[in-house]
Regions:
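A short beta-strand micro-motif
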Residues: 4-6
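Acidic, low-complexity, intrinsically disordered interaction modules
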Residues: 10-11, 15-29
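Short beta-strand-centered segment that lines the nucleotide-binding/catalytic pocket of NTP-utilizing
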Residues: 142-148
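Catalytic cysteine-centered active loop of the rhodanese-like fold, especially the PTP/DSP P-loop
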Residues: 103-138
Length: 148
């Protein structure tokens, strides 16, 4: 199992406050990695969990989202990564395009059958990233949210 950092929060000095950009960051969907088409028919099992709450499942590649942070003026206590406001805050992060490209590159090069994404409690960041991966790139993936 290889663990990859999603993002180093020490670089996130500017942060993001929901409403500043009116939620209109235009993510350009990637179609190729290293001149090869992205396999959007790829079937992947994606697991999400919270490192402080759950035992990690066995995965081929694991992405650590504990240091990834976004800011929003919405109270997220009653929300989770399935909610659009959480996913929009991830997409509107100033480094989203770079981060998603790194994740897709790892998947396309290493051809994992299972990937994991974890954050602290398994409710917001890991769930949001997994849902975005499925919605934007790997529609046939199956997601298991251990923390929900």
């Amino acid at each position: 199992m290889a663990i990859k950092l999603v993002y180093d929060k020490y670089q996130n000095d500017i942060g993001f406050t929901y409403g500043e950009n009116e939620g209109n960051h235009q993510h350009e969907i990637l179609t190729k990695i290293n001149e090869n088409d992205i396999n959007q028919d790829r079937e992947i099992s994606i697991f999400t969990w919270g490192i402080k709450k759950h035992k990690a499942p066995e995965c081929d590649i694991v992405f650590d989202a504990t240091l990834f942070s976004t800011k929003t003026n919405v109270d997220v206590k009653k929300l989770n990564g399935l909610d659009e406001v959480i996913q929009i805050s991830i997409i509107n992060h100033p480094m989203f395009d770079l981060i998603i490209e790194k994740i897709i590159t790892e998947i396309e090069i290493n051809n994992p059958k299972t990937i994991g994404i974890y954050c602290n409690y398994g409710k917001h960041r890991s769930v949001g990233w997994a849902e975005l991966l499925r919605n934007l790139y790997y529609n046939k993936s199956i997601i298991y949210h251990i923390g929900l």
